[in-house]
Swiss-Prot record:
Glycans are attached at residue 27. Sequence repeats lie at residues 225-227, 228-230, 231-233, 234-236, 237-239, 240-242, 243-245, 246-248, 249-251, 252-254, 255-257, 258-260, 261-263, 264-266, 267-269, 270-272, 273-275, 276-278, 279-281, 282-284, 285-286, 288-290. Residues 33-414 form the Alpha-carbonic anhydrase domain. Residues 220-289 have a biased composition (Low complexity). Its main location: secreted. Acts as a negative regulator for calcification in the shells of mollusks. May function both as a calcium concentrator and as a carbonic anhydrase required for production of carbonate ions, which are assembled to CaCO(3) at mineralization sites. Is important for shell formation in both the calcitic prismatic layer and the aragonitic nacreous layer. Shows inhibitory activity of crystal formation when present in free state but, when attached to the insoluble matrix, may regulate the form and size of aragonite crystal. This is Nacrein-like protein C2. Substrate binds at residues 355-356.
Length: 415
C-alpha cells in the first residue's frame, strides 16, 4: 500500500546495476517517484532505496515488510482483540482504477467511513483506506508474506489509516514497544488460495453490471454460522465445520498437484527455498500447529470472487492508464469479504512497514493465519491487467515485494 499516486518508472528511463551489482543513488526527493517490480533493474525492489531519498527506508529500515513468519517462533499474547469493524459489515461504495504496474486499489468514495479498532493491541481509530491484492511472477507464489517459507497465489491487503481528524488518540502499539514512534497504518493481510469448484460459470457483462452494484443472490459471505448456512463458510452453505479439510489445496490434496503443498515456484519454500513443512496439511488443515483447537476452515469467497473477476476484466481497470488519466470503476463491497469466518480469525501481528515505496515504517500488520479461497479466474484476470504502455501485463513481474531479512518480533493470537 502507498499513500501516493506514483509516476510510471519508465517515464524517466530505466537504469541497470553496474558490474558490481550496484545502483547509483539519485538526488531525487519525490515521494511519488516511479518504481518497478522488475528485479533486474535499478527501479526494481532490491534497489528502491536508490530511486529517491524519500525511499531510503526501503534499504536501511529495521522493520521492513513483508517477512517470512516462523510460526513456532511467534509469541502468544493473551487478550489480543477480535478483528471487527465499525459499523459491522457495512457495504461501501468504492472506486477501483488501473494503478499502472502496481496492484489496482479499491478506495472508498468520499463520505464512506468504516473503522477498525483493536483494543489491547493499538490505540486510536483507523479508517478504511483501500483493498488491493498482490500477485507474483508465477501463479503459485504471489503472496508477499509467507509462513514457514510457504507462499500462496495471492495476498489481499486491507489498509486502514489513523484518522487523526476525528480521533485524537495517539497510535501507540501495545506489543512491547520494540520501535519508537507511532503506527499510522493497520494493514490486515489475508492469504488467498485459488480453486475451481463452487464458483459457478464466468459472469458475463450483464451480470457484472449487477454484481459491481452490489446485487448478488447469494450474498451471504458475511455470516457466522458453523454449518455455513449464514455465511463465512462459502456461498453454498455447506462448508462449515463439516466442509473440506482445511488447507488441502484446490482438489482436497496437499497442494495444487497433491505433492508438497504451496512450496513456492519450484516446490521449494520461500524466496531462498527450504523444505518447510513438506506438504503436510500445514496451519490451515485439521493437522495444523495444534490440531483442531486452532485449526482453520478455508472459506470459499464466491461473491468476492465475482466482484474481483468483473472489476479486473473491466476496461477501466484492465487497460493501461497514465497518472491523471485514470477512469474509476464504481464497486460495492464490504471489507469483511476477504476475511476468514469470525471464529477463525486467528492472526499474527508485528510492527513493520508499507511494502511499496516509500516503505514507511509505521505499519501494524495483522496477518490472518487462516486462508481464503477465490476462483482461479480472479488470479487470471489480475495477471492480465495491463501495467505498461505496450500492453505488458502484471503477470510479467508481479506486484509482490520479496520477503525482507530484518528481525522483528512476531506475536500471535492463538496457541
Amino acid at each position: 500500500a502507498s499513500m501516493f499516486k506514483h509516476d510510471h518508472y519508465m517515464d524517466n528511463g530505466v537504469r541497470y546495476p553496474n558490474g558490481d551489482g550496484i545502483c547509483e543513488q539519485l538526488n531525487e526527493t519525490k515521494c511519488d517517484a516511479g518504481f518497478s517490480y522488475d528485479r533486474s533493474i535499478c527501479e526494481g525492489p532490491h534497489y528502491w532505496h536508490t530511486i529517491s531519498k524519500c525511499f531510503i527506508a526501503c534499504g536501511i529500515g529495521q522493520r521492513q515488510s513483508p517477512i517470512n513468519i516462523v510460526s513456532y517462533d511467534a509469541k502468544f499474547r493473551q487478550r489480543l482483540p477480535k478483528l471487527k469493524f465499525k459499523p459491522h459489515m457495512e457495504k461501501l461504495k468504492t472506486e477501483v482504477t488501473n494503478h499502472q504496474n502496481r496492484a489496482p486499489e479499491f478506495e472508498p468514495e468520499d463520505g464512506e467511513n468504516l473503522y477498525v479498532k483493536l483494543n489491547n493491541l493499538v490505540d486510536g481509530h483507523y479508517k478504511f483506506h483501500n483493498l488491493h491484492v498482490h500477485n507474483g511472477r508465477t501463479r503459485r507464489k504471489g503472496s508477499e508474506h509467507s509462513v514457514n517459507g510457504r507462499f500462496t497465489p495471492m495476498e489481499a491487503h486491507l489498509v486502514f489509516h489513523h484518522d487523526e481528524q476525528t480521533h485524537f488518540e495517539p497510535t501507540r502499539t501495545k506489543l512491547g514497544g520494540a520501535f519508537p514512534g507511532h503506527n499510522d497504518f493497520v494493514v490486515v493481510g489475508v492469504f488467498l488460495e485459488v480453486g475451481d469448484d463452487g464458483f459457478g460459470d464466468e459472469p458475463d457483462d450483464e451480470e457484472c453490471k449487477h454484481i459491481l452494484k452490489g446485487h448478488h443472490p447469494d450474498n451471504n459471505e458475511n455470516g457466522n454460522g458453523d454449518n455455513g448456512n449464514n455465511g463465512y463458510n462459502g456461498d453454498n452453505g455447506n462448508n462449515g465445520d463439516n466442509g473440506n479439510n482445511g488447507y488441502n489445496g484446490d482438489n482436497g490434496n496437499n497442494g495444487v498437484n497433491g505433492n508438497n503443498g504451496y512450496n513456492g515456484d519450484n516446490g521449494n519454500n520461500g524466496d531462498n527455498g527450504n523444505n518447510g513443512e513438506n506438504g503436510n496439511n500445514g496451519e490451515n488443515g485439521n493437522n495444523g500447529e495444534n490440531g483442531h483447537k486452532h485449526g482453520c476452515r478455508v472459506k470459499k469467497a464466491k461473491h468476492l470472487s465475482r466482484i474481483l473477476e468483473c472489476a479486473y476484466r473491466n476496461d477501466k481497470v484492465r487497460e493501461f492508464k497514465k497518472v491523471g488519466e485514470e477512469e474509476g470503476l464504481d464497486v460495492h463491497l464490504t471489507p469483511e469479504m476477504p476475511l476468514p469466518p469470525l471464529k477463525y480469525r486467528h492472526y499474527y501481528t508485528y510492527e513493520g512497514s508499507l511494502t511499496t515505496p516509500p516503505c514507511t515504517e509505521s505499519v501494524l500488520w495483522v496477518v490472518q493465519k487462516c486462508h481464503v479461497q477465490v476462483s482461479r479466474r480472479v488470479l487470471h484476470a489480475l495477471r492480465n491487467v495491463e501495467g505498461y504502455k505496450d500492453g505488458t501485463t502484471l503477470r510479467k513481474y508481479g506486484t509482490r515485494r520479496p520477503t525482507q531479512k530484518n528481525k522483528v518480533t512476531v506475536y500471535k493470537s492463538f496457541k
